[in-house]
UniProtKB/Swiss-Prot annotation:
Belongs to the NIP7 family. Monomer. Interacts with pre-ribosome complex. May bind to RNA. Interacts with NOL8. Interacts with FTSJ3. Interacts with DDX24. Residues 1-92 are annotated as: N-terminal domain. It is found in: Nucleus, Nucleolus. GO terms for molecular function: RNA binding. GO terms for cellular component: cytosol; nucleolus; nucleoplasm. This is 60S ribosome subunit biogenesis protein NIP7 homolog. Residues 94-170 form the PUA domain. The gene is Nip7. InterPro entries: NIP7_N, Nip7_N_euk, PUA, PUA-like_sf, PUA_sf, Ribosomal_synth_fac_NIP7, UPF0113_PUA. It comes from Mus musculus.
Amino acid sequence: MRPLTEEETRVMFEKIAKYIGENLQLLVDRPDGTYCFRLHNDRVYYVSEMMLKLAANISGDKLVSLGTCFGKFTKTHKFRLHVTALDYLAPYAKYKVWVKPGAEQSFLYGNHVLKSGLGRITENTSQYQGVVVYSMADIPLGFGVAAKSTQDCRKVDPMAIVVFHQADIGEYVRHEETLT
């Protein structure tokens, strides 16, 4: 387990900033302690300094996971967020999409959000902006990328895609053997 390099930190923070913007500072400087990001087996973990000190006694090859997995770096050095980061990103999300109850199940099975399933969308959401997807009961379901801006969503065909699927809480069941 090692700290992220400058390049890895930049790539990861750019990806997270697509979803929470300048609220990224609130993620790092928390009132309940100091938190940091660490890399282990191409996966980035969000861990408290206190837990990091306790884990120093465990050898790297025996360590499976530590803290919360925020995502992983692909072989092409791009950062991909995991659904396990949802609990930390959802409270700080700038752009949100609420899906109707009938479209929740479709999204949780890994499908995109269609206009017919769109309940609400945050004003001034631009195209290709990172959004957090919520149920109408304000339960975070996952994240995606806005396929259309807020203005375009109003006048688009009901079967058009408005949010591209990225990750959802259904992955806990679908990929339980690979999530760490």
